[in-house]
UniProtKB/Swiss-Prot annotation:
The keyword Heme applies. Pfam families: Globin. This is Hemoglobin subunit alpha-D. It comes from the Eukaryota. InterPro entries: Globin, Globin-like_sf, Globin/Proto, Hemoglobin_a-typ, Hemoglobin_oxygen_transport. It comes from Apus apus.
Length: 141
């Protein structure tokens, strides 16, 4: 459960990302593919080389979906319902991958924000990304 303070911190971080979402998304995906190479199996048609148009484009989609979640912190299930359906029924992505992506996003945020990525922000974002991962995995049950 996200507290009012968590929500405030999440919104602050998201506001700071304005203008660099595509870069953050691409870096997150690239980090995931490097750190967890098994995740590449879901992208057989992608050029997985660093900075490819496909990685940048999908990274932008990932960050846009998270932006939707940030705007709907009180109703994540409804906000992410279509995305949950897509990943569960069409793409059949193993839900563990949502957590792997979340870990990679945390690292990218920390490298971009450096000292501004406080333990409080890390904790709030961890709760947020865990909630998003749980919602995306709901349809698997």
């Amino acid at each position: 459960m996200l507290t009012a303070e968590d929500k405030k911190l999440i919104q602050q971080v998201w506001d700071k990302l304005q203008g660099c979402q595509e870069e953050v998304g691409a870096e997150t995906l690239q980090r995931m593919f490097t750190t967890y190479p098994q995740t590449k199996t879901y992208f057989p048609h992608f050029d997985l080389s660093p900075g490819s148009d496909q990685i940048r484009g999908h990274g932008k989609k990932v960050v846009a979906a998270l932006g939707t979640a940030v705007k709907s912190l009180d109703n994540l299930s409804q906000a992410l319902s279509e995305l949950s359906n897509l990943h569960a029924y069409n793409l059949r992505v193993d839900p563990v991958n949502f957590k792997l992506l979340a870990q990679c996003l945390q690292v990218v945020l920390a490298t971009h924000m450096t000292k501004d990525y406080t333990p409080e922000i890390h904790a709030a974002f961890d709760k947020f990304l865990s909630a998003v991962a749980a919602v995306l995995a709901e349809k698997y049950r």
